[in-house]
Amino acid sequence: MMVTYTTVAVLITIFAIAEAKPKCKTFSQKDVVCTAGKTDYQLVRGLVSDNNKTTGITLRACRIYDIEYESFNDLNSLSYLDLSQNKIQNLKLGVIDEPKQLSYLNLSYNQLTEFPLGLFDQVTKLDLLDLRGNKINKLELGIFDPLTKLNFVDLSSNALVGKDLNPYIFDQSPHITFIDFSRNNMEGSPDNLLHAFQSLQILNLDRCFLKEVPSFATKPNLGTMKHLILSTNQISKLDNPATFVNLDSLELLDLTANVIETINPNIFSPLKNLQKVDLKNNIMKTIPDDLFRNMPKLISVDLYGNQLEEVSVNVFRGSPLKNLNLSSNRITYLQDNFCLELRNSGGKIKKFLFDPNPWQCACLHDLLKEVKRLGIEYNKGKYDGKRPVCVTTAEFNCKRQQNFNEMYIDMFNDVKEIHRNSRSA
Ligand SMILES: *[C@@H]1O[C@H](CO)[C@@H](O)[C@H](O)[C@H]1NC(C)=O
Ligand SMILES: *[C@@H]1O[C@H](CO)[C@@H](O)[C@H](O)[C@H]1NC(C)=O
Ligand SMILES: *[C@@H]1O[C@H](CO)[C@@H](O)[C@H](O)[C@H]1NC(C)=O
């Protein structure tokens, strides 16, 4: 009897251990992919280590809370290591010393707060480092120094405080082309934060608590930059015409969801390669007459969700504009033959979104006739008779005078209100 009991107990223990470990499978003799076991797990030597054929290891969401020394020993061909979506709080100095061929390291969505100096000293071939979604609040000077080949760095959704960042942290990584600081507090970052970069292409500063376009993002060495993302900040003014003078290569400028009210008419003119400007969800009431004039590559302008009443064709004169979005503004009319005039002044308008707006019905009628005649794509689906799209007085003609705007806007808001109430009733 005694003997049987012991055997059962031992068996159960073995089972429990077996289930705690992630399960790993090897594909094409070189790609190891693991899935989580039933409990949290400390990675140790033996699970994925000791195989010189392995080139890739995926330990995504494997409930790993710690990595023991030697876990990656004898992986002399390893170039790809995905440790994302685990619960790692610390990486001990030396744990990633072994796989010297490593070029891709994904540590995103863990609970890392900082790194011991020297952690990356042996993985000098690293090209991509994804640290998104941790709690990193400190980057010690020198931590990235061995990473001279670094190309892609994602630091988004961490607890970085820009004003405490040392501007020399990237000094030995001048070839970074992509860097993402979004969802960190980057207000007050040093002006020379990115001074070492020689070929940056994409800079993401979404949700960084910025009150103005930060000067570290517009320095002369950033003339290679193609995308600058400044969305969801608290930028209110763009009034210095020299702001973007250095950004010769910029193709996309995203200023979505700020509180921009005024824009200097010449601020975009240095951006000769700009293709797309996103200004949606700001609070612009007027748009300067020259703002997008003579921009040789400009094809998309999104002004959705502002408070514009007047938009003149002059704003876009000499630019090959294809897509324009004026939806959700305070527009009751546009100038006569707006689209034709756009085309006559260099525009190539193909897609034009203008609903909702507090349109005067007669003006909307003219515009709809025009877009249909010219074969321009518009928000067709919105005109299904299911909700109010315009307002009119007894007199059905388009009044192109600003002093009537207030009246039509009020009428439209009233109609919308009635419509909403009747639907909820
Ligand atoms: C892997 O290669 C190294 C040197 O190239 C060798 O010393 C080691 O024994 C090999 N390990 C395995 C598990 O084959
Ligand atoms: C890193 O892992 C996350 C989550 O598993 C994934 O969404 C992301 O695309 C990976 N990053 C890169 C650069 O491949
Ligand atoms: C505005 O219109 C453009 C096409 O002209 C479209 O690509 C974009 O998504 C629109 N923006 C919004 C917020 O709907």
Q: What are the functions of these language-model segments?
A:
Residues 2-425:
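Extracellular leucine-rich repeat
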